[in-house]
Amino acid sequence: MRGALKYLFLLIPFWWTAGLEAQQLPIYSQYILNGFMVNPAMAGHDGFTSFNLTARQQWLGFKDAPQTYSASWHTRLLQRSHRIVGNPLRRNNMLIPSTRGRVGLGAYIINDANAQVARTGVSFTYAYHIFLNNQQLSFGLSAKAFQYRIYKESLTFGEAGDPVLNGDFNTVAYSPDADFGVFFRSFDYFVGFSVSNLLQTSVLIGSNELPDFKTYRHYWILGGYRFKMGEELGLEPGILLKTTENWNPQGDLTLKVYYSDLFWGGLSYRTNRSIIALVGVRIDGLYFGYSFDWALSEMAHFNYGSHEISLTFKMGDNARRYRWINRY
């Protein structure tokens, strides 16, 4: 798997030179802190029960700029038991507590608004984790449903008699869909692949004179490696590559520095010519992350950047994180 991770980093130059178009799914800068929103296989992957709240304001100060709010939860169904150490036929053997569990569950609620169009949805996830010595291979499947809404009263129509804009106008539509993901992790590195909008459903919204709005499959590749630099410091380069079936790629290259797993900071470069600053702090089981995106284009003159806040609460002691790996 380390060879696959190296190959993943070799894809970066090619991905960086490809074109970029608008995508239908929201953008996240704190994707490492809440990877479950990107890959359903990460539901319960670390053994914690996690609750996350994320708020993102794109292009602050720009009228009708995109806004995203989400609340998510995922957990591992753990089974506590005991294992025998020594000869089970003798009386001097020992019973040592052990923790097992292969099933992860998760759910989220999201509201994503962009100008006069809003999307609100729910998702439910089932994940299955397979132990491979001190590594783990995970699969996840999500079923989701969304409501799309157009705020017609805020639209500006061109001509009063335009049949496209002033005919039968569906302001609300509903769409079911599904996501699938694979995730592999070790103590010091991780890599994942996921597909969103598997069903590519059509959304009957807007004027009947226009073709149906179709959701496109989105493909995500996530990877990272943690380098230990002494007792307290850690360095983690990471990448997030995403595209649609029409080949509209976008990539994030991130470098984060950790101090004793209590503080972290880093920088990301996104292929839409954005620089992202990330900072975070952990207080016991509470994780707080903030990111600031600054465009390197003319767009920067018309807004005050993009801001994202992520708050995560993880239940369970620190040792629980890898206790399920040593299952024998």
Language model features: what each stretch is:
Residues M1-Y7:
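Positively charged n-region of N-terminal signal peptides that target proteins for export
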Residues Y7-T17:
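Bacterial N-terminal signal peptides
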Residues Q23-Y328:
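Subset of outer-membrane beta-barrel
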